[in-house]
């Protein structure tokens, strides 16, 4: 009985160590980009902020998942960039005005995917922006996502959250250092 108790304590301690290491890794990843880039998407306000070299460069409205679980919360990276990506489910070619993905796609490695399931993209329904309507992606106005696409590099960290905090306060959560104006 004593051996079982000791093994349980060891497993519990290992579990705590592993979980703390995962969170520390996310914080360190954000910290390494502290003077470079960070995208924060706040599902509470349905807004996206892009920070570059300690300054906010872009802040725009977005659309996110129609239910809580559709757009994953967490810390991810941009893993691919595609102009005029086809909409495979509807067999709609890239560049077609019917394409719900719009003109630009920034693929995210959310939920262990390789950037082909979750992304930040344009749309074919400008009235959807600011609402909870997507199947999990983050939609932007086409002009806004084109501007973001031109500035963001593959590897840019992306934090998706649901928070009442301001973007300035959220940069502190992700250890991103803002420059004084």
Model-derived features: positions:
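Cell wall/extracellular polymer interaction/catalysis modules
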Residues: 23-80, 84-85, 103-109, 173-176
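Sec-dependent N-terminal signal peptides of Gram-positive bacterial secreted proteins and lipoproteins
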Residues: 2-26
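Exported/periplasmic cell-wall-interacting domains
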Residues: 30-34, 82-181
């Amino acid at each position: 009985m004593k051996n079982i108790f000791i093994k349980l304590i060891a497993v519990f301690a290992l579990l705590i160590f592993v979980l703390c290491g995962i969170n520390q890794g996310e914080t360190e990843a954000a910290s390494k980009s502290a003077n470079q880039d960070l995208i924060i998407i706040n599902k509470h306000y349905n807004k996206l902020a892009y920070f570059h070299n300690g300054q906010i460069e872009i802040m725009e409205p977005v659309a996110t998942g129609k239910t809580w679980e559709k757009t994953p919360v967490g810390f991810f990276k941009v893993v691919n960039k595609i102009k005029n990506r086809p909409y495979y489910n509807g067999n709609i070619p890239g560049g077609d005005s019917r394409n719900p993905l719009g003109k630009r796609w920034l693929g995210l490695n959310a939920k262990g995917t390789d950037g082909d399931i979750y992304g930040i993209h344009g749309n074919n329904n400008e009235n959807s922006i600011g609402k909870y309507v997507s199947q999990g992606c983050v939609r932007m106005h086409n002009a806004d996502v084109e501007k973001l696409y031109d500035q963001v590099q593959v590897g840019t960290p992306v934090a998706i959250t649901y928070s009442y905090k301001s973007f300035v306060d959220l940069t502190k959560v992700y250890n991103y250092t803002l420059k004084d104006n």
